[in-house]
């Protein structure tokens, strides 16, 4: 690399140390019980122990079997192991490879301590967290390298290719399908932590594009762009703890996708370092010169190489940003309104629709509002029940967002509100929208609390047509609850629509249950297979935005067809002949495809390895 090499600023080192190694998100943010009441509260960096007075009762109601409602509800303690009590095999040694690395990288860019290796072994799926919480850490990477530049990544990949070293890119570590987990300890494995590559390199206000290092985390990306008056406008649920590179590598989708598009719509070009050379694309509005090469890398999950820099479309920081809440009498009313809005060509920035069960969760998630607000809420409920004939067991909350120039927002708001009114929606004003905007990244923290108390929660998401949307929604919920309750295990499931298109939506399921007595993986595997098979039954996609990793590989041939799998396999063999780039992810091996070896996530021969 040309130029003088400088020490990296200490305040930016090791972001993985600021994120929970055995849970979700900020180490300073968590749910806990207040004593002696048992009320569940939330602590954040800004405020301590905010009571959520309805949440405990909600959990009891939904995770109690019929006939057991009068039994005492005890939140059993099932704490995670402390890191000092977790065994991790020592890293393998590869002196020749490491010697050449040390000639090019600073000592501070190479890590092999226990915390670094554990945090670069797993993502944040339920299966990941269960394993790390009980100390089942296998195949931890032997070394973590933290590059500063494209040139350093090039050098690292060249050395990995030379010495046949496995390389796995790591962004924020929020993936939930096994995309960043090393799957074997046969070869020396390096996790490439991209988070020091966190700069907006330039912004072109005329073309409205920006060149960005892809290790930048969501909040820092928007902070740097805002200084130059622009925004990317991409904020997935993982926004606080994910990177631009992760978004590109998994075909991410953000809350504002209805207006700005998904990540592939924002990407103009990028640089990708592969074992056989660096791939670069020309910038431009579009090209008709052959296949769309950027789509070879988009969604490739590090299996072809390492994305280092990307030119992205940006837009001016919006003049007006508004969010509003509405209640629909039923899910069917909400879907009808949503489809009419998409057909009207007057599209909000964001439309989210919560089904009745998730609507009740959102109500239970709220802190106490005070006597006046509670009285007002009670009066609204009476009005909706007696005058509008709303059944509160069926009501659905919706959050609608608008961004842009004030006049444009005014026009879109008026048009959209008219459609909502014609579909029996009741306006709640801007307060629910403001609350959603402030708390939109908080819900994942409930999973850590449930795991600490002998319960679990997981998710499944898909793209489904409007024709099949409601039948999939009903069948999945009924089948899931029945499957577990028939075994004497309480279960709960909800869903929301998070992204909309003219020909379908993203339907996102959240489901929970109590852990079984064996504390094994049976329930997780059953739930994963059950939900994925139901999604396929109704023509849904294998994933809308979570990706494939290795957990979805068992379904990939069924989803993508063997022909496309072979095309991708041939491409990988050409670009990555030694299979050093994130092996056994995204597509099945030939042996897996022909039933000569089990899948890494073996849902086909459903076996339940006891943990």
Swiss-Prot record:
Name the reported effect of residue 508 to F. Answer: Loss of activity
| Cofactor(s) annotated in UniProt | FAD
Keyword Oxidoreductase: yes or no? no
Keyword annotations for this protein, in alphabetical order, are: FAD, Flavoprotein, Lipid biosynthesis, Lipid metabolism, Peroxisome, Transferase
| Residue positions binding FAD | 169-175, 237-243, 250-255, 301-307
Q: Which Pfam families match?
A: FAD-oxidase_C, FAD_binding_4
Family designation: Belongs to the FAD-binding oxidoreductase/transferase type 4 family.
Instruction: Spell out the residues of the site Important for enzyme activity.
Output: 352
FAD-binding PCMH-type domain location is 137-317
GO molecular function terms attached to this record: alcohol binding; alkylglycerone-phosphate synthase activity; FAD binding; flavin adenine dinucleotide binding; identical protein binding
Q: Which gene encodes it?
A: eapA
Q: What class of enzyme is it?
A: transferase
**Looking at the keywords, is Lipid biosynthesis present?**
yes
Q: Which GO terms describe its cellular component?
A: peroxisome
What protein name applies here? Alkyldihydroxyacetonephosphate synthase
Q: In which pathway does it act?
A: Glycerolipid metabolism; ether lipid biosynthesis
For this UniProt entry, which segments traverse the membrane?
Answer: none
Q: Per the UniProt record, which EC number(s) apply here? A: 2.5.1.26
Catalysed conversion reaction = a long chain fatty alcohol + a 1-acylglycerone 3-phosphate = a 1-O-alkylglycerone 3-phosphate + a long-chain fatty acid + H(+)
User: Which segments carry the region annotation Important for enzyme activity?
Assistant: 544-546
Q: What is its main location?
A: other
The intrachain disulfides are none
According to the record, mutating residue 546 to I results in:
Loss of activity
The listed locations are: Peroxisome
